[in-house]
Amino acid sequence: MMLFIPAYYLALGAYQAESEDQRSIFLIGDENQSDRVDVDARIVSLDPLQGEGKLRLVIQPQGNLRHGFSSSKTLKLLSPGAVKANGLGETVFERDRMLTPVDLIYSMDGQASDYPFDVHSAMIVLAINQTGPERSVPFVLWFKGNVPGFAIGLQPIEGLPSGIRAVNLTVTRSATVVNAALAGMVVMWAIGIGVLALIGLMLTGWYNIRMPALFAALLFGLFSLRNSLPGTPPIGTYSDFLAFLWVQGIVALALIVAVVATLKHRPL
């Protein structure tokens, strides 16, 4: 009990720290400019298997650019490298029209098969122009990232004009996911070592009639354990080569040895 209480407290502290990190808000730009556009960018979803990340933008004009809940000027949002969820191309916000959120889909570079140590990255570039006449509009980017199971890092690109914002996005598995995956691999190897010990006993003549059933259950149970790891991709990941495939082979070998031992000890 004396060890359980500190461990429980540390676990809650780790959750709180990870939760606060996920709720972090990154400010890119100068919010002291009165006539500007505030862009609230939130990462809605991340899909390492598809290599895609979905970003939702909410546009809020300020100062002379604001007219109630709309814009006093026609604004054009440029997002090179991104695909709109409802099509391709730029987004135009007509003056005195209700401003609606915009969903953008970005391609991410990375290998999901490196799970749980996979790293994915993308460059996000946004620009806002005013039409009639065409000119850039200064804007501030509020970037929020809170996707369970992932740790999100942002590195703003400096030295750009006030109407252009760019950021390098880096996505990794959260500490909770990495620790859970490592714990699963440790459990697999514990099972594998135990099965190796049983193989050694069977080879020296020890036999138990329940062994074939035990190894057959473990053979299929390992698949369930492997697939229950958080966010695990299909089979063939780095974690599989570290633990699952090895232990699966050990259990399969043990099942063969147990079947041979059963045939050897069968009643006449």
Task: Identify the meaning behind each predicted range.
Residues Y9-L10, N208:
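Compositionally biased, intrinsically disordered low-complexity regions enriched in proline and serine
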Residues M1-Y9:
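Hydrophobic membrane-insertion alpha-helices, especially the h-region
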Residues A175-L268:
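Alpha-helical transmembrane segments forming the membrane-embedded cores
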Residues L10-L12, I191:
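Membrane-associated alpha-helix detector
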Residues D21, M123, G149, G153, ...:
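A generic structural micro-environment signature
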Residues I128-A180:
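Membrane-proximal, non-transmembrane alpha-helical segments
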Residues L12-A151:
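Soluble non-transmembrane domains of integral membrane proteins
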Residues L88-V102, I128-R135, I157-V167, L203-I209, ...:
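Generic structural signal for short, solvent-exposed loop/turn connectors between secondary structure elements
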